[in-house]
């Protein structure tokens, strides 16, 4: 009888512990989410800080650490938590909902910037096209100017040549006029010699 009476009270506290576990704290996932929400850290809450929060606010058993690790991994895989730092259960975690709420606000800004940037890009393109058109004649002008720059040097030479050419006929005419006089002069001494 003593053995049975000793066994019965031993069994009752086990049941009461099980009932206490069910009633003392909510699910680990809920506790982890509550811990992350309570911290509200920009860099995210670490697993150690989550464990401390749960142990301080809830009555948890000895295997709480392992349960917290498993539940954190499940929450990350399900998408409710996002891991900001580290790998696996070790690292910093944020609520995915909070990130999603922040991201849509950022996305439209990016879209606005993208929408504005093509307009800005379109304007320089138009501006680039117009100078390109202007540049083409400029290039032609430059090409014309370059030989023009080279030409001024030969052009005076040509002008000088033309002047000399113009002067040559005059000189030639003068020379021609002088030439007949010279042979006459030469002929005159010959004639004088013959006369002698």
Swiss-Prot record:
<comment type="similarity">
    <text>Belongs to the histone H1/H5 family.</text>
</comment>
<feature type="domain" description="H15">
    <location>
        <begin position="24"/>
        <end position="97"/>
    </location>
</feature>
<keyword id="KW-0238">DNA-binding</keyword>
<keyword id="KW-0158">Chromosome</keyword>
<dbReference type="InterPro" id="IPR036388">
    <property type="entry name" value="WH-like_DNA-bd_sf"/>
</dbReference>
<dbReference type="Pfam" id="PF00538">
    <property type="entry name" value="Linker_histone"/>
</dbReference>
<feature type="region of interest" description="Disordered">
    <location>
        <begin position="1"/>
        <end position="29"/>
    </location>
</feature>
<feature type="compositionally biased region" description="Basic residues">
    <location>
        <begin position="104"/>
        <end position="196"/>
    </location>
</feature>
<dbReference type="GO" id="GO:0030527">
    <property type="term" value="F:structural constituent of chromatin"/>
</dbReference>
<dbReference type="InterPro" id="IPR036390">
    <property type="entry name" value="WH_DNA-bd_sf"/>
</dbReference>
<keyword id="KW-0539">Nucleus</keyword>
<dbReference type="GO" id="GO:0006334">
    <property type="term" value="P:nucleosome assembly"/>
</dbReference>
<dbReference type="GO" id="GO:0030261">
    <property type="term" value="P:chromosome condensation"/>
</dbReference>
<dbReference type="InterPro" id="IPR005819">
    <property type="entry name" value="H1/H5"/>
</dbReference>
<dbReference type="GO" id="GO:0000786">
    <property type="term" value="C:nucleosome"/>
</dbReference>
<feature type="region of interest" description="Disordered">
    <location>
        <begin position="78"/>
        <end position="196"/>
    </location>
</feature>
<comment type="function">
    <text>Histones H1 are necessary for the condensation of nucleosome chains into higher-order structures. The histones H1.0 are found in cells that are in terminal stages of differentiation or that have low rates of cell division.</text>
</comment>
<keyword id="KW-0226">DNA condensation</keyword>
<protein>
    <recommendedName>
        <fullName>Histone H1.0</fullName>
    </recommendedName>
</protein>
<dbReference type="GO" id="GO:0003677">
    <property type="term" value="F:DNA binding"/>
</dbReference>
<dbReference type="InterPro" id="IPR005818">
    <property type="entry name" value="Histone_H1/H5_H15"/>
</dbReference>
<dbReference type="GO" id="GO:0005634">
    <property type="term" value="C:nucleus"/>
</dbReference>
């Amino acid at each position: 009888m003593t053995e049975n009476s000793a066994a019965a009270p031993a069994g009752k506290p086990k049941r009461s512990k099980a009932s206490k576990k069910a009633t003392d704290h909510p699910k680990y996932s809920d506790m982890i989410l509550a811990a992350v929400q309570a911290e509200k850290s920009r860099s995210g809450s670490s697993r150690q800080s989550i464990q401390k929060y749960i142990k301080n606010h809830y009555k948890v058993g000895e295997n709480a650490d392992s349960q917290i690790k498993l539940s954190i991994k499940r929450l990350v895989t399900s998408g409710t938590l996002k891991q900001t730092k580290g790998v696996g259960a070790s690292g910093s975690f944020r609520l995915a909902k909070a990130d999603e709420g922040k991201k849509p606000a950022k996305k439209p800004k990016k879209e606005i910037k993208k929408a504005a940037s093509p307009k800005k890009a379109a304007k320089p393109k138009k501006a680039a096209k117009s100078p390109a058109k202007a540049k083409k004649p400029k290039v032609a002008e430059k090409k014309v100017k370059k030989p023009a720059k080279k030409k001024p040097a030969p052009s005076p030479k040509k002008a000088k040549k033309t002047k000399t050419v113009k002067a040559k006929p005059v000189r030639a005419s003068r020379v021609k006029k002088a030439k007949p006089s010279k042979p006459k002069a030469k002929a005159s001494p010959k004639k004088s010699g013959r006369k002698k």
